Design a protein with these regions (language model features):
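Short substrate-entry loop that stabilizes the transition state in hydrolases
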Residues: 66-79, 84-122, 236, 258-262
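Domain-level recognition of soluble alpha/beta enzyme cores
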Residues: 20-84, 104, 264, 301
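Alpha/beta-hydrolase active-site loop
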Residues: 126-152, 156, 169, 173, ...
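Mobile cap/lid helix-loop segments that gate and shape the active-site cleft of serine hydrolases
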Residues: 49-68, 185-239, 258-262
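Short beta-strand immediately N-terminal to the catalytic nucleophile in serine-hydrolase-like folds
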Residues: 161-163
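Active-site-adjacent alpha-helix of alpha/beta-hydrolase-fold enzymes
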Residues: 23, 245-325
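Cap/lid segment of the alpha/beta-hydrolase catalytic domain
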Residues: 58-62, 89, 93-97, 113-135, ...
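N-terminal signal peptide c-region/cleavage motif recognized by signal peptidases
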Residues: 12-17
Length: 345
């Protein structure tokens, strides 16, 4: 028995070392648009051809970054693609832990900063164009597909989208869910303290006839073959019919620590009840908060955030008495990779 355990331990250590040694490339670019009124910052993590010297990416006094080799040549062969969507007021750096982990497992991962709802750009005019978020991901897919010499060749039948918070709403839209602003406004009268309702009110995307018309459109991208939502918001505005007919598999992960403005029972779990049972997986992580899906805070990081923006230090908190964020995120990575492998995405 001891020899078997020793062999298993050696196998695990070898696999871990191999994962660490996998060369990961990193590139940053800005995508112009036809009208030049919504330039999009995009970063891409990808399997690299050589073990180029890695650097810490998105590492700062508050958050732990991840290692990648800037501008390294991409590895040969085709690789599945994942596009990432951050939450309201966030940025691509929030999910570096996930992007780098997926790239180590052979995925090309593209993440964007959504204009108007990113910490890098809080323009009210851009924020009001909520319907542009799914289109941002489609633009990222276009850009990666068009530049195989930069990022590697994409296995076009394996394209997935992953999003946190309103990024979860974004990937559900790109999968085929349809939003009804009238339904959502009515629901927010009943649940005004939900974070999705508060953020939606600030953005006011249905404040004009044009905005309302854009929000109800089909924003799906048929190239996307699977989606993952991480503690999403705004889900109560999705129509029952569109959720019931969602054409791609979905993994819905929720933080199990409820707060006044974020409840899995009213968001993720409620949405899953309206989705196809055969192609939907739901996991509620009991010791995860809404912010457990963001980058790991460094010691002293919470104090620095509080100093700069009192009250926002809560983004460093996970479930009381629960596991450290690193362990929660390892579970999330395992859930996502197993789901994508199972669905062939």
């Amino acid at each position: 028995v001891k020899s078997t355990l020793a062999a298993l331990l050696l196998l695990c250590l070898t696999a871990a070392a191999s994962a660490e040694e996998t060369a990961i490339g990193f590139r940053s670019s800005t995508l112009p648009d036809a009208q030049d009124n919504r330039p999009l910052q995009m970063v891409v993590w990808y399997p690299a051809a050589t073990a180029a010297t890695p650097e810490l990416i998105a590492d700062n006094p508050v958050f732990v970054g991840a290692r990648g080799a800037p501008d390294a040549p991409p590895a040969a062969g085709e690789h599945p693609l994942v596009v990432l969507s951050h939450g309201y007021g966030g940025n691509w750096g929030n999910q570096v832990w996930l992007a780098s982990a997926l790239a180590r497992q052979g995925y090309i991962v593209a993440a964007v900063n959504h204009p108007g709802t990113t910490s890098k750009d809080r323009s009210p005019q851009a924020a009001a164009q909520l319907w542009q978020r799914p289109k941002d991901l489609s633009r990222a897919i276009d850009a990666v597909l068009a530049q195989p010499t930069q990022f590697g060749a994409v296995a076009k039948q394996r394209i997935a989208a992953v999003g946190h918070s309103v990024g979860g709403w974004t990937v559900m839209e790109i999968a085929g869910a349809r939003f009804d602003p009238v339904l959502f406004a009515r629901d927010c009268d009943i649940h005004p303290k939900l974070g999705g309702c508060i953020g939606y009110k600030q953005m006011n995307p249905a404040g004009t006839p044009v905005g309302k018309a854009e929000l109800v459109k089909d924003l799906s991208d048929k190239r996307v073959t699977a989606v993952v939502s991480l503690d999403l918001g705004l889900s109560r505005g999705f129509t029952d019919a569109s959720l019931a007919a969602l054409p791609v598999p979905a993994l819905v992960i929720a933080g199990g620590v409820p707060t006044e403005d974020m409840s899995p029972e009213l968001e993720s779990a409620d949405m899953v009840r309206r989705m196809p049972k055969a192609s939907t997986q739901y996991v509620e992580i009991g010791d995860a908060t809404h912010f457990s899906f963001m980058a790991i805070c460094k010691p002293g990081g919470m104090a620095l955030i509080e100093e700069d923006s009192p009250g926002d230090g809560m983004i460093c908190r996970d479930g009381e008495g629960g596991r450290p964020r690193e362990s929660i995120q390892q579970q999330v990575v395992e859930l996502i990779t197993a789901f994508l492998a199972h669905t062939g995405s």
